[in-house]
């Protein structure tokens, strides 16, 4: 199915997901993913996959809720980084409470982001709804209901940012 999505969604094309040195990406996933996400699962979904996802509810089996609930309930936004490159892809919750973010994510089975939570500098949506990073990381899919809703694999956004020297930060 080919379609376009309304702004602020930024469309991309198939060339983003062309074959590169490591599947659809230039690099494999980072070795020390956040929230105890499984690196093997992450590498398979991020770099060698176009249609599959981590199983529904996988994100609840990680340490995400244990580690982030206090921050979220205190009104702090959570940054989600590309598991390959460490680039900032999503920041949530924005324009809603942490509880609303978790409730929607629980209802759909994957972390669910809205337009205001997407960093459009690094995220693109392909005409079939596949949501990817500009570097070729498979993230998930746009499944619009009332508005655009991005159901994203936690293993795809469990990366760590890089410091000013390009080194992966070990703590956040």
Question: PLM features: what roles do these ranges have?
Answer:
Residues 1-172:
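Flexible coil/turn and secondary-structure edge motifs
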